[in-house]
Amino acid sequence: MSMLAERRRKQKWTVDPRNTAWSNDDSKFGQKMLEKMGWSKGKGLGAQEQGATEHIKVKVKNNHLGLGATNNNEDNWIAHQDDFNQLLAALNTCHGQETADSSDKKEKKSFSLEEKSKISKNRVHYMKFTKGKDLSSRSETDLDCIFGKRRNKKLAQDGCSNSSADEVNTSLTTTTTTTSAFTIQEYFAKRMAQLKNKPQASAPGSDLSETPVERKKGKKKNKEAADTDVENSPQHKAKRHKKKKRVEAERGPVAKKRDRAELQPGGPSEDECSDASVEAAEDCVQTPDIQDDVPKPKKRKAKKKLQRPEGVEIDATLDRAPVKKKKKKVSR
């Protein structure tokens, strides 16, 4: 019975804890086979019968330690590690590692995959497979490009400096010197003769000077043709017709005032009245809707001709009816 202060432990009791029923059984399959081969009870296993004569004892393992480990050997792990390191060192010395010379020899003994495929019995020699996979004939730069390796910048700079030095040396060595048999006077005489034989370059200059003038004339002609086309267009004619109607509608009271002023003594002359009527008509015409289309001076003459016969007709009617005199407002 355990003490009250101790930890409670579960214990399992079996009928045969030492497994004596199995050890005392002589009809086991393994024992029969060993007896057929010359073994008997009390002898050890092995060729010289030096093995254990008793059965292996079973021990209950209730911890996380390795097989065969006990609490007494917990502090000996450093010694175990040292023994393991010594064992590895002994194995390395016995078998021996490969030296650097052997690795260099292996690198030199490179084989061609293409030749190996030709020799093989299975005949797997196809050009598109073997030649593309055979890297023995490739240079270091090609392999670096394939596998994506980058070289140091120092090596690239050294290569550039060496190439530039070689170019300078080649340029110095490949310079050629020519000696002419002509004298200085003969050389210049030859050059002057060549210059005289060349065609004069003044003609193309005159052509170039004439071309801008011709271009300007062509532009003016194109503009005039475009203006005539616009004037002859039906839209432009309709606009002019509307303008004339507006001018006549707005010019009616202005013409009446002018005729009345002519009948008054000391009134303005016909030319002054016509000029005033034209100016008033122009003021009326220049409305905000039609500010862009300003009438040309040629149309003023036509307007004067149209205004004069109307004035004559109005004078004939005014002779018959009495006219009231009105003062004219002067705009300042």
From Swiss-Prot:
Compositionally biased tracts (Basic and acidic residues)? 307-322
- Record field: compositional bias (Basic residues): 236-246, 297-306, 323-332
- What Pfam families does the database record attribute to this sequence? G-patch (PF01585)
Q: Which PROSITE patterns match?
A: G_PATCH
- Keyword line: Centromere, Chromosome, Kinetochore, Nucleus, Phosphoprotein, Telomere, Tumor suppressor
Keyword Transferase listed? The answer is no
This protein's GO cellular component annotations are: chromosome, telomeric region; kinetochore; mitochondrion; nuclear chromosome; nucleolus; nucleoplasm; spindle
**Which locations, inside or outside the cell, does it occupy?**
Nucleus; Nucleus, Nucleolus; Chromosome, Telomere; Chromosome, Centromere, Kinetochore
Domain G-patch, chain residue ranges per copy: 26-72
Q: Which residues does the annotated region (Telomerase inhibitory domain (TID)) include?
A: 254-328
Q: Where is this region: Disordered?
A: 1-27, 196-332
Phosphoserine: modified positions: 233, 269, 274, 277
Positions occupied by motif TBM: 291-301
> Which Gene Ontology terms cover its molecular function?
protein-containing complex binding; telomerase inhibitor activity; telomerase RNA binding
By sequence similarity, the record places it as follows:
Belongs to the PINX1 family.
* Protein purpose: Microtubule-binding protein essential for faithful chromosome segregation. Mediates TRF1 and TERT accumulation in nucleolus and enhances TRF1 binding to telomeres. Inhibits telomerase activity. May inhibit cell proliferation and act as tumor suppressor.
Quaternary state and interactors? Interacts with MCRS1, TERT, TERF1, NCL/nucleolin, and the telomerase RNA.
- UniProt note: domains: The TID (telomerase inhibiting domain) domain is sufficient to bind TERT and inhibits its activity.
Q: What is this protein called?
A: PIN2/TERF1-interacting telomerase inhibitor 1
